[in-house]
Amino acid sequence: DQYIAYGADQCFKMYDLFEDPENHLLHQARGFMDDVNAISQDHWSRGNGWGIIGLADMLQYLPQEDPRWQEAARRMQRHAQALARYQTERGLWRQSIACDLAWEESSGTGLIAYSLGVGIRMGVLAPETFLPVLQKAIQGLADYCLHDDFSTELSCHGCLCPGKGKAKGTLQAYLCDVRA
């Protein structure tokens, strides 16, 4: 039980630190730039996927009467609504989610889609709103990212903030990052 409490506490602290109060997306990192307290400007798709999957896990494994379950549900609803606004026409999310110039990315899309599915199954996300978003993501992954030989397209090649020096972690560094 202490490990469950610790895990939930860490997930909520991550949201408290990285959630953008304006668009409710998560920023990627703190401490990778010259200023160790600076938070990256971007809203990295894989980072948002890892965040919401933590909430999805809590919803699956905590009892519903646990106050942490209710908190995870509230945060998932807010984050899922934010993410749905930025899904592309092809059903994917961009590497830097809120930037129309960023390329579409498969791994963040997969993490987000899985989490939306859990939210729907657990009764936290309204199926009439989020099932079309989930279906569009699955179709986008199938159409644009997965090949018959199981190779993939549009995936991030690393996890560190792109860029060097003062440009590290900036939106420009993300836009210039090479696709893998």
Regions found by a protein language model. Name each.
Residues I4-Q28, A73-G91, V133-F150:
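Long, well-ordered core segments of solenoidal/helical folds
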Residues W93, C99, W103-E104, G110-A180:
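CBM-like carbohydrate-recognition segments
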Residues P21-H24, G47-L55, A84-Y86, T109:
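A structural motif
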Residues E22-H24, R30-D34, A102-S106:
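Active-site-proximal cap/lid insertion segments
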Residues D1-Q2, W50-R68, L111-L125, A180:
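Well-ordered alpha-helical scaffold segments within catalytic/enzyme domains
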Residues L26-R46:
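Acidic/Ser/Thr-rich, low-complexity mid-to-C-terminal regulatory regions of eukaryotic proteins
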Residues I4-A8, Q41-S45, G49, D66, ...:
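Non-membrane alpha-helical structural segments and their capping/turn regions in soluble enzymes
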Residues I52-I97:
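Oxyanion-binding "anion nests"
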